[in-house]
UniProtKB/Swiss-Prot annotation:
Organism ancestry: Bacteria, Pseudomonadati, Pseudomonadota, Gammaproteobacteria, Enterobacterales
Example of a GO MF term: 2-succinyl-6-hydroxy-2,4-cyclohexadiene-1-carboxylate synthase activity
Reaction catalyzed: 5-enolpyruvoyl-6-hydroxy-2-succinyl-cyclohex-3-ene-1-carboxylate = (1R,6R)-6-hydroxy-2-succinyl-cyclohexa-2,4-diene-1-carboxylate + pyruvate
Cystine pairings recorded for this chain: none
Protein family: Belongs to the AB hydrolase superfamily. MenH family.
Protein name as annotated: 2-succinyl-6-hydroxy-2,4-cyclohexadiene-1-carboxylate synthase
Length: 252
């Protein structure tokens, strides 16, 4: 079994760019940014429970990494960068720390490196279970209306929230709930030590208005790019800013 993905081919000899979306996104999420880099072959992945991979279920990050590895092999992708936002960034960091043959580097936008104590994990588990129950049982428009009121999305205005609620409500609530629980921060290990000892290039992007993740970025041994005029979802709020950072990283 492999993950559903869309491919766009570039020039031979350059590494692939493998894009991983955030929770409730899909393979289209990164394309406004990714299609600027047409010299590179691009793979836009649907993570388990999302988009064309909605029917794929996992028990945890190990399963996601295994599926990602098999997907890369199936497309004969031998050299690549992982580019991930939020959940996709966490998947990218986890997979990279577990080891992926051919990995050139990891570019993470607003991805959490992991909670650091049992109390934080217990609280996050309670919260994610409550959200998962709502995703399973309530209309998605109502759930996402509340989801985007969370502090991490404070930089969004009302129009941006309405647009995101409408977009994300096309998902399957049950499969979102399953993926939320399987990849909760409560079950993700703290990756700070692994990232400090890494053997791959590591870049971190965060929005200027995303105070939580700017603080987290300062804790990581990564080259950090702060995206101006953007909050947590920087590639949506300021795609040009993210494109500029990726171009600098890739020496485009």
């Amino acid at each position: 079994m492999i993950l559903h993905a869309q491919t766009k081919h570039g020039k031979p000899g350059l590494p692939w760019l493998v894009f991983l979306h955030g929770f409730s996104g899909d393979c289209h999420e990164w394309q406004e940014v990714g299609e600027v880099f047409a010299d590179y072959s691009r793979l836009y992945v649907d993570l388990p429970g999302h988009g064309g991979s909605a029917a794929i279920s996992v028990d945890g990050f190990d399963d996601v990494t295994d599926l990602l590895r098999k997907t890369l092999v199936s497309y004969n992708i031998l050299d690549f960068w992982l580019v991930g936002y939020s959940l996709g960034g966490r998947v990218a960091m986890m997979a990279a720390c577990q080891g992926l043959a051919g990995l050139c580097g990891v570019i993470v936008e607003g991805g959490h490196p992991g909670l650091q104590n049992a109390e934080q994990r217990a609280e996050r588990q309670r919260s994610d279970r409550q959200w998962a129950q709502r995703f399973r049982t309530e209309p998605l428009t109502a759930v996402f209306a509340d989801w985007y009121q969370q502090p991490v999305f404070a930089s969004l205005n009302d129009d941006q929230r309405r647009e995101l609620v409408a977009l994300r409500s096309n998902n399957n609530g049950a499969t979102l709930a399953a993926m939320l629980e399987a990849t909760s921060l409560a079950v993700q290990p703290d990756l700070r030590a692994n990232l400090s000892a890494r053997t791959f290039a590591f870049y971190y992007l965060c929005g200027e208005r995303d105070s939580k993740f700017r603080a987290l970025a300062a804790e990581l041994a990564a080259d950090c790019h702060v995206i101006p005029r953007a909050g947590h979802n920087a590639h949506r709020e300021n795609p040009a800013g993210v494109i500029a950072s990726l171009a600098q990283i890739l020496r485009f």
